[in-house]
């Protein structure tokens, strides 16, 4: 008998569907009363503690999810990824971001070639270059040290490095290394973003890192040309070679742009943009800011999870457990979203990065074989650090829609504060909420409890909390470069597990192409209208034509062939 093409056709999927009704009838108050169950839903690896006992699941549910993983050939798919098979079938590519953080003596192959030596050649080049910039042996065109870095990229070339940078800013070791230096990220083609990035900076002390694999990404290259003009108008055209470097594989276009090809840092087709933070995309700007030694610890942390993911049995495998639980929440319980709630301000950019990793990877409507999916896949990811989120969207999470939550806590703060006379210190206050919120979601508050508290009858419906809202808790011992790398890799592999089980390609992103191609048509129309005065006519529907015409009429003062104008703030 042939293997079913869709995971939903397997007996394991059908068994979970049959199991679903019993779980729906069981409140988390009851499930949490079973100590043995709770103990079985706690896993530890390298002092990272995962508690998923507040999921709407019994031990039987978890066992059935293991059966689903087996039916999806999850272990074989993980092995195929590590072996360099072309699991990104629509682009015929390997998926080897694990190679980016592999030790120097490792062997990870793509198309029969060990790619690890290539990775380390680039890492060694980054180490050498970043150290020369940091120690002042590489200087700008006027002889001044380059203390400020603007990394120009978009999507995965921006969100991942920004997450790591923000997390490292308050780490004692990293912040000490970064003293007197500044790292900024320019992503949006909106000129306001360029204005904010160059505000207060001196071109003489600024180094620009342009990140584009092909060196043709429209938004990135327009921003790069804007910064090139900013530098050359102040220092002369020849200064570009000293003040701009590239992360790219297209050396001819790098050279044509004015950047010395020797100052281009490579990455490869087997690295997807949203998985590229451990490549030169992230390692170069982060090393310039914090020093290569700190960034190497980040890579080592990610590698430790890579090893755990590839070797740990499923019942002890943190990314596998997280991925299977997400499949359960989305495709069976019908919860379309997930809140990522780190109780650490240093992780404020985690949710935006994972939003891209998850939604661009798993926002697919067809299987890897091109069959329409008869079930929901992918989830809407969002989040905010605690306790900020509690005063923002937690109202909906507690009394509105059911949204599974990831609570992420850190045992030791990067920046402890102790005030004499306070009942608890600042970090204890933060963590009090970290421990309380999952229970509030799970247990809720019943009308009977409110009556015992003598709450007015008319307020009881408003103060009732239904509870039975799933969450999980991840407790990290610290938040240094190593742990940040671990957290990144946990979420990367979790997303892969979901895609492997759903049977989709988590490593392409055709959904971003249509809007880009339509924007090309609009761009041509804007140019024709500005330069030749042509009206908006053919090729647009009435709505778009109306909006475009209003825009052009309101910006008729924009010159057709303007002289260069740079931001002024």
UniProtKB/Swiss-Prot annotation:
It comes from Clarkia xantiana. PROSITE patterns: P_GLUCOSE_ISOMERASE_1, P_GLUCOSE_ISOMERASE_2, P_GLUCOSE_ISOMERASE_3. Belongs to the GPI family. It catalyses: alpha-D-glucose 6-phosphate = beta-D-fructose 6-phosphate. Transmembrane segments: none annotated. The keyword Isomerase applies. It comes from the Eukaryota. Keywords: Cytoplasm, Gluconeogenesis, Glycolysis, Isomerase. Homodimer. The keyword Zinc-finger does not apply. The active site is at residues 360, 391, 516. GO terms for biological process: gluconeogenesis; glucose 6-phosphate metabolic process; glycolytic process. GO terms for molecular function: carbohydrate derivative binding; glucose-6-phosphate isomerase activity; monosaccharide binding. HAMAP family: G6P_isomerase (MF_00473). InterPro entries: G6P_Isomerase, G6P_Isomerase_C, Phosphoglucose_isomerase_CS, SIS_dom_sf, SIS_PGI_1, SIS_PGI_2. Its EC number is 5.3.1.9. SUPFAM superfamilies: SIS domain (SSF53697). One of its GO terms (cellular component) is cytosol. This is Glucose-6-phosphate isomerase, cytosolic 2. It is found in: Cytoplasm. Pathway: Carbohydrate degradation; glycolysis; D-glyceraldehyde 3-phosphate and glycerone phosphate from D-glucose: step 2/4. Gene3D superfamilies: 1.10.1390.10, Glucose-6-phosphate isomerase like protein, domain 1.
């Amino acid at each position: 008998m042939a293997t079913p093409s869709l995971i939903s056709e397997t007996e394991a999927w059908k068994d979970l569907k049959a199991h679903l009704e019993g779980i729906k009838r069981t409140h988390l108050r009851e499930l949490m009363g079973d100590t043995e169950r709770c103990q079985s839903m706690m896993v530890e690896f390298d002092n990272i503690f995962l508690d998923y006992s507040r999921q709407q699941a019994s031990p039987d549910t978890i066992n059935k999810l293991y059966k689903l993983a087996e039916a999806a050939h999850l272990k074989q798919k993980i092995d195929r990824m590590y072996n360099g098979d072309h699991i990104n079938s629509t682009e015929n590519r390997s998926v080897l971001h694990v190679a980016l953080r592999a030790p120097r003596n490792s062997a990870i192959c793509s198309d029969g070639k060990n790619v690890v030596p290539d990775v380390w050649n680039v890492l060694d080049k980054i180490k050498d270059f970043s150290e020369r910039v940091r120690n002042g042996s590489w200087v700008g065109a006027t002889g001044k040290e380059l203390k400020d870095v603007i990394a120009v990229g978009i999507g995965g070339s921006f969100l991942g490095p920004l997450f790591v940078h923000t997390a490292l800013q308050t780490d004692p070791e990293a912040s000490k290394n970064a003293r007197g230096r500044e790292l900024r990220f320019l992503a949006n083609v909106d000129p306001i973003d360029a204005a904010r990035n160059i505000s207060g900076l001196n071109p003489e002390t600024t180094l620009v890192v342009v990140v584009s694999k092909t060196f043709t990404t429209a938004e990135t290259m327009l921003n790069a040309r804007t910064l090139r003009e900013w530098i050359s108008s102040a220092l002369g055209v020849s200064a570009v070679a000293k003040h701009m470097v590239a992360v790219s594989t297209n050396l001819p276009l790098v050279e044509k742009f004015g950047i010395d090809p020797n100052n281009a840092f490579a990455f490869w087709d087997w690295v997807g943009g949203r998985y590229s933070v451990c490549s030169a995309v992230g390692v170069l700007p982060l090393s310039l800011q914090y020093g290569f030694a700190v960034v190497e610890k980040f890579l080592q942390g990610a590698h430790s999870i890579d090893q755990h993911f590839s070797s740990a049995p499923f019942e002890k495998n943190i990314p596998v457990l997280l991925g299977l639980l997400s499949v359960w929440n989305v495709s069976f319980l019908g919860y379309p979203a997930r809140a990522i709630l780190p109780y650490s301000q240093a992780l404020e950019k985690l949710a935006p990065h994972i939003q891209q990793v998850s939604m661009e990877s798993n926002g697919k409507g067809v299987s890897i074989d091109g069959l329409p999916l008869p079930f929901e896949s992918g989830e809407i990811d969002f989040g905010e650090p605690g306790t900020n989120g509690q005063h923002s969207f937690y109202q909906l999470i507690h009394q509105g829609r059911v949204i599974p939550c990831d609570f992420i806590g850190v045992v030791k703060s990067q920046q402890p504060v102790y005030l004499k006379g306070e009942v608890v210190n600042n970090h204890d206050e933060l963590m009090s909420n970290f421990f309380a919120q999952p229970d509030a979601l799970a247990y809720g508050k019943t009308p009977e409890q409110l009556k015992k508290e003598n709450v007015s009858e008319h307020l009881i419906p408003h103060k009732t909390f239904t509870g039975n809202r799933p969450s999980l808790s991840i407790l990290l011992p610290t938040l240094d470069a190593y742990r940040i790398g671990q957290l990144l890799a946990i979420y990367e592999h979790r997303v892969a597990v979901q895609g492997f089980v759903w049977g989709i390609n988590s490593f392409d992103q055709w959904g971003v192409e249509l809007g880009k191609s339509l924007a090309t048509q609009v761009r041509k129309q804007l140019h024709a209208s500005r330069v030749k005065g042509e009206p908006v006519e053919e090729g647009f529907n009435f709505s778009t034509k109306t909006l475009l015409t209003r825009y052009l009429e309101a910006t008729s003062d924009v010159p057709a062939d303007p002289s260069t104008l740079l931001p002024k703030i």
